[in-house]
């Protein structure tokens, strides 16, 4: 009897592996595959919990629920379609496998579907032709505003213009020589007024003394 049970389990396991189809649970069970209940997930239930039962609260270090599990909300209500989003990798919708057996639990790659495949879109946004415009190397640079020929264009050369050729500093104003003008040549100090000889005049020689 025991050998028969072992063989039956082996045959069942081989069939599941070959067909990649999970074992259909009992009609009163809820089932979710490959859920990571990290530390902080308040409730993580094993597959033996039935609908309406209360889940066991798990605390402490992270718990890897790699087998078929059910994540419950705080009040333990596991009925579909409630969402379990308590610190798990992805929000999880409870599946009533008795009513809707639509998930292939052996195929987790359905969560890795490329966005392009999901959209059925062939635009390939990652390699779009937007880059061909190449705004960074556009011909704006050929105008070369920085080296425009404003300076050598007119050669006005304001700094060396002929304004300075008038030579205001050395103009001929100084040649009049006001300091050495001929005013001094009149020689007022040595004028001939003194030569009139008033002191030596002949007033004393009029001959008044000759009356005696």
UniProtKB/Swiss-Prot annotation:
Disordered: annotated span: 108-180
Positions of region (15 X 5 AA tandem repeats of K-D-Y-G-H): 120-210
UniProt keyword terms in alphabetical order: Repeat, Secreted, Signal
Coiled-coil regions listed: none
Biased composition (Basic and acidic residues): 117-180
Source species, domain of life: Eukaryota
A GO cellular-component term linked to this record: extracellular region
Start and stop residues of the Sequence repeats: 123-127, 128-132, 133-137, 138-142, 143-147, 148-152, 166-170, 171-175, 176-180, 181-185, 186-190, 191-195, 196-200, 201-205, 206-210
Leader sequence segment: 1-18
Subcellular location: Secreted
Annotated protein name in UniProt: Uncharacterized secreted protein ARB_06108
Species name: Arthroderma benhamiae (strain ATCC MYA-4681 / CBS 112371) (Trichophyton mentagrophytes)
């Amino acid at each position: 009897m025991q050998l028969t049970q072992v063989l039956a389990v082996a045959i069942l396991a081989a069939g599941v592996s070959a067909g990649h189809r999970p074992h259909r649970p009992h009609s009163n069970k809820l089932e979710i595959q490959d859920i990571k209940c990290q530390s902080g997930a308040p409730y993580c239930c094993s597959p033996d919990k039935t609908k309406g039962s209360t889940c066991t609260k798990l605390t402490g270090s992270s718990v890897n629920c790699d087998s078929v599990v059910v994540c419950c909300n705080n009040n333990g209500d596991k009925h579909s379609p409630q969402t379990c989003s308590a610190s798990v990798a992805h929000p999880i919708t409870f599946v009533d496998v008795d009513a809707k057996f639509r998930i292939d639990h052996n195929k987790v790659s359905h969560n890795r579907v490329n966005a392009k495949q999901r959209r059925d879109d062939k635009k390939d946004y990652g390699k779009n032709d937007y880059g061909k415009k190449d705004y960074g190397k556009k011909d704006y640079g050929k105008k070369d505003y920085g080296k425009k020929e404003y300076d050598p264009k007119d050669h006005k050369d304001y700094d060396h213009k002929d304004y300075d050729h008038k030579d205001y500093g050395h103009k001929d104003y100084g040649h009049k020589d006001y300091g050495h003008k001929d005013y001094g040549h009149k020689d007022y100090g040595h004028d001939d007024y003194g030569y009139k000889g008033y002191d030596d005049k002949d007033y004393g020689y009029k001959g008044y003394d000759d009356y005696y």
